[in-house]
């Protein structure tokens, strides 16, 4: 590993995630995730359709895939930003997970979170998550 690579792994990374669907309760859904250094250099991104899913399932799937992307690069410190207040509040323990299908996804996300040395997740307004939202829209358009 280069000295620069080692330095990056010691620092924290930024992960913006988003999930969405075509508007029906179980419409075509897609996820987007953007992994960057703290200097906003893009390291990796995800833009893919995930099949029929609710908006909240897509949001959780985006978080899970983004965390897997970071762990696959041996990243230890991460700051996550997403525009789903529900997912952010549930991951932070502010709100209970009341739906069984979300509970399973919450458990997967929690297990991934535990693998980081430091983790923080914060809600951001949609306009501050535009790049991740764009990745979702790209994936949805690709399937049209």
What are these regions (language model features)?
Residues 3-57, 68-76:
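RNase H-like nuclease fold core
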Residues 33-36, 52-54, 98-100, 139-143:
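Short, low-complexity, polar/charged sequence segments that are solvent-exposed and flexible
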Residues 20-26, 64-136, 142:
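RNase H catalytic domain
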């Amino acid at each position: 590993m280069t000295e620069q690579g080692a330095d990056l792994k010691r620092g924290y990374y930024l992960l913006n995630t988003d999930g969405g669907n075509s508007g029906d309760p179980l419409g075509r859904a897609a996820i987007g995730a953007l992994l960057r250094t703290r200097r906003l250099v893009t390291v990796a991104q995800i833009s893919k359709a995930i099949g029929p899913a609710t908006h909240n399932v897509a949001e959780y799937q985006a978080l899970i895939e983004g965390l897997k992307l970071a762990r696959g690069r041996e990243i230890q410190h991460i700051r996550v930003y997403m525009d789903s207040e529900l997912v952010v509040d549930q991951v932070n323990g502010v709100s209970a997970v009341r739906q069984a299908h979300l509970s399973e996804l919450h458990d997967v996300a929690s297990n991934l979170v535990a693998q980081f040395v430091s983790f923080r997740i914060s809600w951001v307004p949609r306009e501050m998550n535009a790049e991740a939202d764009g990745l979702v829209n790209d994936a949805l358009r690709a399937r049209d």
